[in-house]
Amino acid sequence: MLKRGLLFLTVLLLLFSFSSITNEVSASSSFDKGKYKKGDDASYFEPTGPYLMVNVTGVDGKGNELLSPHYVEFPIKPGTTLTKEKIEYYVEWALDATAYKEFRVVELDPSAKIEVTYYDKNKKKEETKSFPITEKGFVVPDLSEHIKNPGFNLITKVIIEKK
């Protein structure tokens, strides 16, 4: 009787341990690897295709630095319109990555712009395009003939305040 009980318990434990392993495998396989490519670090995945890199410094109304979050990359699609409202939304996500729900965006620096640098195959030289941040926004250009992963960079100061 004791041997049967131990055998039953062993089989039961094996079943539970295998079910937890298969759950972990299925959870890791649900990550959409098609949108990202693996970088040098195993925990870092670089977006494939165009992306917006937000690298901002949060300051108060007097220019004193309040927050300097790590940069964050957001996948974007060619043909998408990036308005000031959308960009502020991405900036708030970057702030939340460091201090979740503590700050809100008051205003972007008036001189803020988004830049992309790539090698133009037609002109055979480096090109830098700048896009102003406006209410109307700008359409993300398709640069796929020149570069696989164009990085549209927003590097600026942002006026923020506590929520």
Swiss-Prot record:
Q: Which domain of life is it from?
A: Bacteria
Cysteines paired by S-S bonds: none
Is the keyword DNA-binding assigned to this protein? no
**InterPro entries given in the database record:** SAK, SAK/SK_sf
Record carries keyword Transferase: no
Which UniProt keywords are given for this protein, alphabetically ordered? Plasminogen activation, Secreted, Signal
- Major subcellular location class: secreted
* SUPFAM superfamilies linked to this entry: Staphylokinase/streptokinase (SSF54328)
Gene Ontology cellular component? extracellular region
- Signal peptide residues are 1-27
Entry-linked Gene3D superfamilies? 3.10.20.130
Give the UniProt subcellular location, in the record's own words: Secreted
Role: Potent plasminogen activator that converts plasminogen into plasmin. It forms a 1:1 complex with plasmin, which in turn activates other plasminogen molecules.
Q: Which family does it belong to?
A: Belongs to the staphylokinase family.
Q: What is this protein called?
A: Staphylokinase
The species this protein belongs to is: Staphylococcus aureus (strain MRSA252)
